[in-house]
Amino acid sequence: LNAVGRKKIKYPALLPLFVPCIDLVSETHILNAFELGADGVILLGCENSHLEQIETAVKFANMALSAFDLGERVFLISDGQCDAEDFAKETADFVKELSPSPIRNMKREKIDFTKPKRDVLLELIQNLHKKTKVHPSLIEENTQFPFADVAIDSKCTICNACVNLCSTNALSKEGNKVNFVYGNCIACGLCERACPEEAITLESALDFSRLVEKEGKTLVEPELIACAGCGKLFMSRSAFERISELLKEREGDSGGKGELSVEEQLELLRYCEDCRASKAVE
């Protein structure tokens, strides 16, 4: 910009915002510019910038804008790759292709940037949905971005391993149900690796239609079995069957030795924790 000014080269009217380093700019900052009324965003890097990082942010922002029919409105220029004349020309070419943003004059929502970055990002995307009234259909499978879909099959025993390890609350347990909020998932894969039954499958995917959903979905709700004593529903059938298998396997390994036979242990397994104690001393 200084070089362009010294040479008195004409370029489109811009509002320069200086940051300590362009690497500090994320997709949330870029999308917030459109929330504040920008028609487009130009990012000017320097020779010390980590271009891969900012290119990722630019790609996501352009995908988000395109998902809501706003088109690509973010342009990255590397300072090390152009002189003053090139900068002026590239800027002019970019601005020439820009149309006024359809949401530029709409009510601006105040974004709380002290919240976790993912919460801010989801709020910005939901604002785009609300303002454009477009239900996005853009999906990128095997995405480089930290989003994933999770599936749980019938082997799940509701052991809580995945829920306990999920630091973003993408997975939660409600009664005997495991629920999933797609927007909260950061694709870390801990749930998949932690599942002792190998019942969880995680697939990387960026699905903008699910980012505008505020409610989660139930991944699994296994059948519960009733206590043979009091009739209370107390254990999932999958857990009952899995524990029964382990007890039978243990019988073969131990030669049937123990205070209780496998048959007796299997019988006690049919009772809830309250009835089991009294049944064991009969």
Predicted regions, residues:
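Conserved short loop/turn motifs at secondary-structure junctions
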Residues: 47-51, 79, 180-183
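Phosphate-binding active sites in nucleotide-utilizing proteins
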Residues: 31, 164, 171-172, 184, ...
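Short cysteine/histidine-rich metal-coordination sites, predominantly Zn2+-binding motifs
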Residues: 180-183, 204-213, 243-253
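Ferredoxin-type iron-sulfur electron-transfer modules and their immediate structural context
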Residues: 1-2, 6, 66-67, 72-174, ...
